[in-house]
């Protein structure tokens, strides 16, 4: 369980780093803006460019968002209850878009995503293991 101030610092530093990062070869990605009640999920094997796609969508959207990469060692131990503090940060900033990279690292993440989708949040996630590639994921996100 992390204090809100620690989560805020990680969010801020990851955003600063993201803004400076080379986004690689830009891909033409369309259709995701129509997914108002669904999560946009980028999945695949490790090192295939999922994070780059997520970063490009975030940059191209130009809307305020929270981008969080869960492979950040500062987030080791992040758990479901920490999403509540992250949500407070989003609400205080008037943000309703999340970009979560390697979210499969967090146990129970599906319930947070499902709840936010029900509240019309825009959710973009990436992941690379069997858990995020599972056929059961759809039912976990839709109830």
Question: Whereabouts are the PLM-identified features?
Answer:
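Phosphate-binding site recognition
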Residues: 1-143
């Amino acid at each position: 369980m992390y204090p809100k101030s620690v989560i805020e610092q990680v969010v801020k530093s990851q955003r600063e780093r993201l803004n400076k990062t080379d986004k690689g070869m830009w891909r033409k990605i369309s259709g995701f803006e129509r997914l108002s009640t669904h999560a946009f999920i980028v999945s695949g094997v490790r090192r295939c460019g999922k994070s780059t796609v997520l970063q490009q969508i975030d940059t191209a959207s130009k809307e305020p968002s929270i981008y969080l990469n869960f492979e950040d060692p500062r987030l080791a131990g992040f758990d479901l209850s920490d999403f509540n503090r992250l949500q407070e940060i989003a609400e205080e900033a008037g943000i309703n878009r999340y970009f979560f990279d390697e979210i499969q690292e967090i146990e129970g993440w599906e319930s947070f995503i499902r709840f936010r989708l029900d509240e019309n949040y825009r959710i973009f996630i990436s992941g690379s293991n069997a858990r995020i590639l599972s056929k059961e994921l759809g039912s976990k996100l839709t109830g």
